[in-house]
Amino acid sequence: MATPVKKWLLRVAPWFLPVGIVAVWQLASSVGWLSTRILPSPEGVVTAFWTLSASGELWQHLAISSWRALIGFSIGGSLGLILGLISGLSRWGERLLDTSIQMLRNVPHLALIPLVILWFGIDESAKIFLVALGTLFPIYINTWHGIRNIDRGLVEMARSYGLSGIPLFIHVILPGALPSIMVGVRFALGLMWLTLIVAETISANSGIGYLAMNAREFLQTDVVVVAIILYALLGKLADVSAQLLERLWLRWNPAYHLKEATV
């Protein structure tokens, strides 16, 4: 059993490196080793964050970016899950869909930005389409992989107990594939923000990416850093949310049990 002190150290350990980096960053800025034209001090970044927050501009852009990300992820994730289920559960579905999907997956979706702008312009549809496209493939692949790697002995045993069709899917196939599906979700959440960052910096008139690009035009490096930190925090928040869902939905799986840390 870990002592309370060890438990506390394990909880705060992930913050040691970020706090150390910020401390060195502030020191380098204070003594003049780091020019504010290259990188503003942490104090300057906090001031810029407070100014943008007080004016409401930051929250407006944050809400728009979050809306784009969630809508795009919902569309792409749903399509990826459905197509993955079809390919994973049906050999004919795999023959019909998998080759085409794999060909599309090997085309970098961000390379389609010029074409997407021609199709949709710079309105919301373009960003949502790119996010949906970027999040579709990780969930599709991991859904297919999860279904195909279910222990066939479990499936046969369930059938011997009279399970088939939808009950078999709900009680055996879906729980067995869920760990792999959640891995796909976590990958997709990372790609969601990556795609949105690029899309908003190229074709947008609102959002955090637009805020950063607009600040660049006026050499406001503090605002650019605020935008970068926001993207990092949003990505971390999305990953933590996925981890919590894993622990909730997979609490029956010993691999996802919360264990006491031991040293």
UniProtKB/Swiss-Prot annotation:
| UniProt topological domain (Cytoplasmic) ranges | 1-13, 65-68, 123-125, 186-187, 239-263
Transmembrane parts of this sequence: 14-34, 44-64, 69-89, 103-122, 126-148, 165-185, 188-208, 218-238
Q: How does it sit in the membrane?
A: Multi-pass membrane protein
Identify the GO cellular component terms for this protein. Answer: ATP-binding cassette (ABC) transporter complex, substrate-binding subunit-containing; membrane; plasma membrane
- Has UniProt tagged this entry with the keyword Lipid biosynthesis? no
Q: Where the protein is mainly located, per its record?
A: membrane
Q: Name one GO molecular function term.
A: ABC-type alkanesulfonate transporter transporter activity
Keywords (alphabetical) are: Cell inner membrane, Cell membrane, Membrane, Transmembrane, Transmembrane helix, Transport
Ranges of the Periplasmic topological domain? 35-43, 90-102, 149-164, 209-217
Tell me which Gene Ontology terms the entry assigns under biological process.
alkanesulfonate transmembrane transport; cellular response to sulfur starvation; sulfur compound metabolic process
Give the subcellular location. Cell inner membrane
Classification via Pfam families: BPD_transp_1
Q: Write down the superkingdom of origin.
A: Bacteria
Q: Which residues form a coiled coil?
A: none
Q: Where is the ABC transmembrane type-1 domain?
A: 58-242
Q: Does the record carry Transferase as a key word?
A: no
Q: Which family does it belong to?
A: Belongs to the binding-protein-dependent transport system permease family. CysTW subfamily.
Q: What does this protein do?
A: Part of a binding-protein-dependent transport system for aliphatic sulfonates. Probably responsible for the translocation of the substrate across the membrane.
* Protein name from the UniProt record: Putative aliphatic sulfonates transport permease protein SsuC
